[in-house]
């Protein structure tokens, strides 16, 4: 079968069409041809394709194919892309696409990113000249994917399959477009088989109809056997479609009148001709009836290269669109002819997963099927599929439902964002799937939808980590739900009542049928109703379990977030809902997927409110991910109680409803908590390399914190009619920069948060100052209502300010969420910022993501704020009581130590005291109050619980001595406020004892600036500090570096906390008080330089027992008491003034302790230093040792290699010697041979005349012919194969020669195989002993030594002698290096004997006589000198020392000649 003309031009023939053989089939050309044919057809319309674009290739004069310049120009100019893209991606008809970038952006808005080999294709790539075809192919593939997802969706496929299949199993559900296509084909073909079965049975009873099948080509083989036609199952879309059986059967089912079953070749084993027949049938059908939608050649469909998978998918999607959406007149699905019944249709169409699920759960499931699903079946068959909004989220399907095999990707890249929220685990599990509405249009390439490749890296872990249960849970109907009441959970019902088809932008029609669990069409609730449902039903599920709270971080309480979400949902208009229907594209985890984040540009303000953007793409993630589960859940859960639908998995929100839920509109619902944003960013950055947004594959959206019910607020009816609002097209281009912008927004939000908290702190401090001033004014009067009022007023101010800021921030979409978080956290003390794991917050706060509106929070905030104010007032009440006690103490102390003031020298005070002083100052004093780090969610101090509550107070004039740690200490004033932390601020303080277990007391530090009386008190305070430091050690150590607060004006400190009732406050007994002299047992803290501020610090616990207020002496002795307290409880601390002596003693002890501690620290430091040095030295030594080992290893390796080489050389030499059996014999042999030398010499000279007589011509000839060869070979030792084996024996210049360097090499390598001794590569030596060099010698004599007619006689004679000899090895004796022939010897390698056979020379030759060895090169007909000293069987000629020839050379040669002859 030779090459055919363009296969597209071939007409179907009943002879096998000519096709290109597989080895001649160019896959890359085929891909280009298919892509360009499709693109041109979509750009110009199949009827209007210009002639020059019909075949994109031309052949040059060298028979090389190239793309035609017009096609290249159209590609480079983007005209084709703009034309096709405008048809396929027309979300905005008013704004035509112009340029490559516009098309890329439009695709990105669809969630499809153009990637070539995992790199994003840019406009520059598409403009490159010469054309970069791979980028253009990627672009076309992405357009094809966009078109594919417009034509076909998993939901439509399932709805279609429900018409033809009575029962579905959960495992049958398709999970991406490719799988959906195969699912559709298989279901339809199964139904066709059922029809044929019934027809065959009927034929048995109605034989008249039997002839109808006579023409079928399969009938001869199968029908006669009464077998059904073999319609293969499609398991691999490409490979199983190569024979055309399944596809032709599918076409027959839909168009039985056009493509008759009898015309299809259906066999068990299909031949090539059969396959071509079917494929040709398919092509002709598509060309004639389906507007040339098949852009393949026969070879393309037959060989089914993986590169054309996207082409095949778009072809199948178009078939589906024609058959199930457009349904032209010729599309009339086949029914059972004899009875006119449709067995499959009679069977109720069961929602795919519901059937399987109900089999498990409902005993009466079978009875329910018919009642529940008959209507949906009928409706879906009429409409051709569950209606999806025109935007048809690309691959929105059952991506997250369950993991299936991952497939290779199209041209997209994406990555997965998976959030795991503990709080959603409990309540959302049963409801997980509820929100996946059938109308999940906004979804972009879902994992399920994305071609199988797209799902490559998807993580299918459910949000709450319950991976195993994901499928069942999604389908689970809450047992409390009313299964009988079809809930109007889905606005899809808007479309369910419409059987009309809405034209997609690309002409695809979409039908959306919304059915309840019983198959009844659902009346979707209004948005307000849906929101109300959400509001009412969602709270219970959101209540987190305690363990969930502990395990997760919840920035916001759920109640508020739910309230917000409800409000925002109410605020969002149906228009927004409509706009957002396409809003969010799930992000696939695959690195190869074209999916991206779909964020509706309409819905998201230009500012890209962080929350909304985050939420948008996260929500879309979830909603998209689970289209399949969504479909099933819609069936399943519609009947269930609305509460089920409210599972906190916002991910289930369909993208359509997302605008409502996520408030993607400019108002921007803040759906994301900071922690969640960070978490997302972490996940997001993990996938950054993928080049596209990631998609959540888990069915739950709980991590999104969006109420499920929002999904019910599906797009209103107009949504179906507005194809232009394709969700996937919204803001995709901006999403490309989302990651960077999210980071910026996060920073802005954090800054705003700090700002808000700083303002709040300032207000709180003002309030505290007012309260303290009031307390000072009315020391002896009980609680001052003014103070409470002031506190309340301050709180109100703070609240009002915060509210105003909140309003302003609301205007700024990005900050609104952060403000909501801040406000909630600041205003609701119990559920404060929980950055620390120990302080869990209401999960609902974590759900702040869903909080749509913050204005509605005001009431709740007011309540909580009021509570905090009340708590503050109670704290102030304690302070008032304490003030009274302190006034009594002050009077006593003033009497005792009126003028005494001592300053603690800088080294004396313990650093912890310093720290404590500073902490209180910073936390309590307004000057220090600025934005607390503690205000931020993270408590600055690790152990805020242990911090005792103290307030900074007034300072005196005493000097501060700067400390090396930059803490300035005012000697006389010691403030022991606890380190600032979440618990230190009432607004952030958690009052649950578990959270602040150690906080047992509140301290009020205050004093008059100028009172010298307070200095003694301060002294006692300082004394008591060490004891208190024990109690507050953790906190004390934490802020050594905090700023000192100016003592003079810091008159007020915040009420840091109330005493925690949980902790036991043991007040010092009088016995304890009587031990004032007892040294502070805990000079653990290095003393800090005393402060100038005069503070009297009294534990509130002391205030509580009334008796202590009366005992002033108790206060004098209080320090030791306090120390005892600290020893026992470490919770109640107070500062009291003592005698100077006691203070001095205490100071001395403190100094000693400090010195001891310093020494200890120095020792520890030195020890640590030594250890570090030792470690460093050890590391260096290790490194040195390793380096030495490496070097030694290298040297050893080198030496080993050298040794191996030397050993190899030695063995080679030994081998050579062994071959010749001359392993260096002892010298005695040589001596023995010496005795024979005279004879040989004598004989040599006697015989030598022979040559002059008979062979002068011979020698001259041999000189002439051999000299060149020998001279060339003299230096052959230079570098030859054999020279390697005998390198030690090279004789570089035996005699000057012309070309001799290479002779040896050539001789040895090209000599005849018979010698077997030449070097032939890695083998340096070949055993020749068993062979004979007889023929080599004969060749040498005939062609070299005795060549020519002149030497004919001598040559014949010598050859005859050789024939007579039994020897295997012969040697030629040369006169010298000139290679003149003298005689022929026999050589026995075993005995190493060399005996003369004929010619002139010694009778025998010994080793010592040999001077040179020669090897004959049969090709060059020359002898080459062998650079060796050892004789072996590979030697063909030798020379002997010249002195052996010269003896009596002229003596009577003629006499000897006759005798010799």
UniProtKB/Swiss-Prot annotation:
Residues 896-1007 are annotated as: MBD region. Residues 1321-1455 form the CKK domain. GO terms for cellular component: ciliary basal body; Golgi apparatus; microtubule cytoskeleton; microtubule minus-end. The modification Phosphothreonine is found at residues 401, 652, 970, 975, 977. Residues 677-687, 787-826, 1011-1028, 1104-1124, 1163-1224 have a biased composition (Basic and acidic residues). Residues 361-389, 573-613, 639-704, 787-855, 921-992, 1004-1044, 1069-1090, 1102-1124, 1163-1321 are annotated as: Disordered. Keywords: Cell projection, Coiled coil, Cytoplasm, Cytoskeleton, Golgi apparatus, Microtubule, Phosphoprotein. Interacts with CAMSAP3. Interacts with KATNA1 and KATNB1; leading to regulate the length of CAMSAP2-decorated microtubule stretches. Interacts with a complex formed by AKAP9 and PDE4DIP isoform 2/MMG8/SMYLE, which recruits CAMSAP2 to the Golgi. Interacts with MAPRE1/EB1. Key microtubule-organizing protein that specifically binds the minus-end of non-centrosomal microtubules and regulates their dynamics and organization. Specifically recognizes growing microtubule minus-ends and autonomously decorates and stabilizes microtubule lattice formed by microtubule minus-end polymerization. Acts on free microtubule minus-ends that are not capped by microtubule-nucleating proteins or other factors and protects microtubule minus-ends from depolymerization. In addition, it also reduces the velocity of microtubule polymerization. Belongs to the CAMSAP1 family. This is Calmodulin-regulated spectrin-associated protein 2. The gene is Camsap2.
């Amino acid at each position: 079968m030779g090459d055919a003309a363009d296969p597209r031009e071939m007409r179907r023939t009943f002879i096998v069409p000519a096709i290109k053989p597989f080895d001649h089939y160019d896959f890359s050309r085929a891909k280009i041809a298919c892509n360009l044919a499709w693109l041109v057809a979509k750009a110009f319309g199949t009827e209007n394709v210009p002639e020059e674009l019909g075949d994109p290739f031309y052949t040059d004069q060298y028979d090389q194919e190239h793309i035609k310049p017009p096609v290249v120009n159209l590609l480079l100019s983007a005209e084709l892309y703009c034309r096709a893209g405008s048809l396929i991606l027309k979300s905005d008809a008013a704004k035509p696409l112009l340029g490559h970038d516009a098309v890329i952006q439009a695709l990105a808005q669809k969630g499809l990113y153009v990637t070539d080999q995992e790199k994003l294709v840019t406009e520059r790539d598409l403009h490159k000249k010469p054309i970069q075809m791979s980028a253009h192919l990627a672009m076309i593939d992405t357009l094809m994917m966009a078109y594919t997802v417009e034509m076909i969706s998993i939901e439509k496929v399932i709805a279609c399959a429900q018409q033809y299949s009575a029962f579905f199993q959960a495992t049958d559900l398709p999970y991406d477009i490719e799988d959906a296509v195969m699912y559709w084909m298989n279901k339809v073909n199964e139904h066709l088989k059922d029809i044929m079965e019934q027809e065959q049975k009927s034929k048995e009873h109605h034989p008249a109809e039997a002839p109808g099948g006579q023409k079928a080509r399969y009938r001869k083989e199968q029908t006669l056997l009464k077998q059904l036609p073999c319609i293969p199952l499609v398991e691999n879309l490409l490979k199983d479609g190569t024979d055309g059986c399944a596809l032709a059967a599918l076409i027959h089912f839909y168009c039985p009148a056009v493509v008759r079953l009898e015309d299809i070749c259906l066999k068990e084993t299909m031949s090539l001709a059969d396959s071509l027949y079917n494929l040709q049938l398919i092509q002709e059908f598509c060309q004639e009836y389906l507007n040339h939608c098949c852009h393949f050649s026969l070879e393309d469909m037959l060989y089914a290269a993986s590169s054309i998978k996207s082409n095949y998918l778009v072809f199948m999607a178009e078939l589906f669109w024609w058959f199930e959406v457009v349904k032209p007149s010729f599309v009339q699905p086949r029914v059972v002819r004899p009875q006119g019944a449709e067995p499959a249709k009679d069977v109720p169409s069961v929602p795919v997963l519901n059937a399987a699920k109900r089999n498990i759960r409902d005993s009466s499931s079978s009875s329910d099927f018919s009642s529940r699903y008959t209507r949906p079946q009928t409706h879906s068959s009429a409409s051709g599929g569950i209606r999806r909004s025109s935007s048809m989220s690309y691959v929105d399907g059952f991506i997250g439902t369950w993991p299936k095999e991952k497939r290779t990707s199209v041209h997209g890249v994406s990555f997965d964002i998976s959030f795991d929220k503990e709080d959603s685990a409990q309540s959302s599990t049963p409801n997980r799937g509820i929100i996946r509405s059938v109308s999940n249009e906004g979804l972009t390439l879902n994992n399920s939808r994305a071609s199988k490749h797209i799902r490559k890296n998807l993580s299918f872990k459910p949000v709450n980590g319950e991976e195993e249960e994901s499928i069942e849970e999604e389908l689970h109907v809450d047992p409390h739900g009313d299964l009988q009441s079809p809930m109007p959970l889905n606005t899809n019902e808007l479309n369910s009542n419409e059987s009309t088809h809405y034209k997609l932008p690309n002409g695809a029609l979409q039908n959306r049928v919304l059915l309840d669990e019983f198959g009844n069409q659902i009346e979707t609730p209004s948005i307000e109703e849906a929101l109300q449902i959400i509001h009412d039903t969602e709270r219970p599920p959101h209540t987190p379990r305690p363990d969930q709270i502990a395990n997760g971080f919840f920035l916001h309480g759920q109640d508020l977030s739910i309230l917000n979400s409800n409000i925002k949902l109410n605020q969002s208009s149906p228009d927004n809902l409509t706009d957002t229907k396409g809003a969010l594209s799930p992000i696939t985890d695959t690195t190869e997927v074209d999916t991206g984040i779909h964020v509706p540009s309409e819905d998201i303000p230009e500012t890209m409110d962080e929350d909304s953007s985050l939420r948008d793409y996260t929500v879309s993630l979830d909603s998209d991910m689970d289209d399949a589960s969504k479909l099933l859940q819609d069936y399943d859960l519609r009947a269930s109680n609305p509460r089920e639908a409210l599972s906190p998995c916002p991910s289930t929100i369909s993208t359509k409803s997302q605008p409502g839920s996520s408030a993607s509109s400019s108002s921007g619902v803040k759906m994301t908590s900071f922690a969640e944003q960070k978490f997302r960013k972490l996940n997001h950055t993990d996938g950054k390399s993928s080049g596209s947004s990631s998609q959540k594959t888990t069915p739950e959206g709980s991590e999104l914190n969006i109420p499920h019910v929002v999904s019910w607020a599906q797009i209103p009816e107009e949504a179906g009619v507005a194809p232009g609002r394709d969700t996937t097209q919204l803001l995709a281009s901006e999403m490309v920069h989302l990651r960077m912008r999210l980071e910026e927004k996060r920073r802005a939000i954090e800054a705003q948060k700090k700002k808000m908290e700083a303002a709040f702190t300032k207000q709180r401090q003002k309030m505290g100052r007012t309260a303290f001033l009031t307390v000072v004014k009315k020391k002896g009067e009980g609680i001052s209502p003014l103070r409470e009022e002031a506190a309340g007023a301050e709180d109100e101010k703070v609240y009002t300010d915060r509210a105003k800021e909140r309003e302003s921030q609301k205007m700024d979409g990005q900050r609104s969420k952060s403000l909501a978080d801040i406000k909630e956290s600041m205003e609701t003390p119990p559920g404060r910022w929980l950055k620390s794991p120990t302080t869990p917050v209401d999960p609902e706060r974590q759900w702040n993501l869903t909080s749509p509106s913050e204005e509605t929070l005001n009431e709740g905030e007011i309540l909580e704020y009021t509570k905090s104010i009340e708590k503050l007032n109670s704290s102030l009440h304690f302070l008032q009581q304490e003030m009274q006690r302190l006034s009594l103490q002050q009077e006593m102390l003033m009497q005792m130590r009126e003028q005494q003031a001592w300053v603690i020298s800088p080294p004396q005070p313990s650093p912890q005291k310093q720290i404590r002083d500073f902490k209180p100052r910073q936390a309590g004093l307004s000057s220090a109050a600025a934005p607390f780090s503690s205000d931020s969610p993270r408590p600055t101090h690790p152990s805020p619980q242990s911090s005792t509550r103290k307030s900074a107070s007034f300072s005196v004039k005493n000097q501060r001595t700067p400390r090396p740690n930059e803490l300035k200490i005012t000697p006389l004033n010691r403030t022991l406020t606890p380190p600032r932390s979440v618990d230190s601020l009432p607004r952030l303080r958690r009052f649950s004892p578990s959270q602040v277990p150690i906080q047992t007391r509140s301290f009020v530090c205050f004093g008059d600036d100028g009172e010298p009386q307070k200095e003694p008190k301060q002294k006692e305070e300082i004394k008591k500090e060490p004891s208190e430091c024990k109690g507050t050690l953790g906190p004390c150590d934490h802020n050594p570096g905090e700023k000192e607060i100016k003592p003079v004006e810091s008159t007020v400190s915040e009420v840091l906390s109330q005493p925690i009732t949980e902790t036991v406050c043991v007040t010092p007994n009088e016995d304890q008080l009587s031990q004032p002299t007892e040294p502070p047992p805990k000079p653990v803290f290095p003393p800090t330089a005393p402060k100038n501020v005069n503070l009297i610090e009294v534990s509130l616990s002391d205030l509580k027992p009334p008796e202590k207020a009366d005992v002033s002496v108790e206060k004098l002795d209080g320090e030791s008491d306090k120390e005892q307290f600290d020893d026992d409880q470490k919770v109640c601390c107070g500062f009291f003034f003592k005698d100077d002596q006691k203070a001095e003693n205490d100071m001395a002890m403190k100094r000693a302790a400090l010195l001891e501690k310093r020494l200890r620290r120095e020792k520890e430091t030195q020890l640590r230093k030594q250890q570090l040095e030792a470690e460093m030295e050890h590391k260096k030594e290790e490194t040195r040792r390793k380096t030495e080992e490496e070097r030694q290893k290298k040297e050893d390796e080198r030496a080993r290699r050298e040794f191996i080489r030397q050993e190899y050389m030695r063995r080679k030499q030994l081998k050579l010697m062994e071959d010749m059996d001359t392993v260096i014999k002892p010298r005695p042999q040589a001596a023995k041979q010496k005795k024979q030398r005279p004879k040989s010499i004598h004989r040599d000279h006697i015989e030598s005349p022979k040559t002059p007589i008979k062979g002068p011509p011979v020698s001259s000839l041999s000189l002439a012919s051999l000299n060149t060869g020998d001279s060339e070979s003299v230096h052959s030792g230079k570098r030859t194969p054999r020279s390697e084996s005998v390198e030690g024996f090279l004789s570089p210049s035996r005699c000057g020669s012309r070309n001799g360097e290479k002779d040896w090499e050539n001789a040895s390598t090209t000599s005849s195989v018979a010698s077997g001794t030449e070097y032939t590569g890695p083998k340096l030596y070949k055993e020749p002993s068993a062979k004979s060099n007889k023929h080599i010698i004969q060749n040498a004599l005939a062609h070299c030594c005795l060549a020519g007619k002149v030497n004919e006689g001598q040559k014949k004679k010598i050859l005859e002698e050789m024939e007579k000899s039994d020897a295997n090895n012969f040697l030629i004796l040369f006169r010298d290096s000139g290679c003149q022939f003298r005689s022929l010897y026999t050589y026995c390698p075993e005995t190493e004997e060399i005996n003369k056979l004929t010619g002139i020379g010694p009778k025998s030759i010994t080793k010592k006589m040999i001077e040179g060895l020669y090897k004959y090169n049969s090709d060059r007909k020359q002898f080459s000198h062998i650079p060796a000293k050892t004789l072996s069987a590979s030697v063909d000629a030798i020379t002997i020392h010249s002195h052996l020839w010269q003896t009596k050379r002229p003596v009577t040669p003629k006499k000897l000649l006759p005798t010799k002859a």
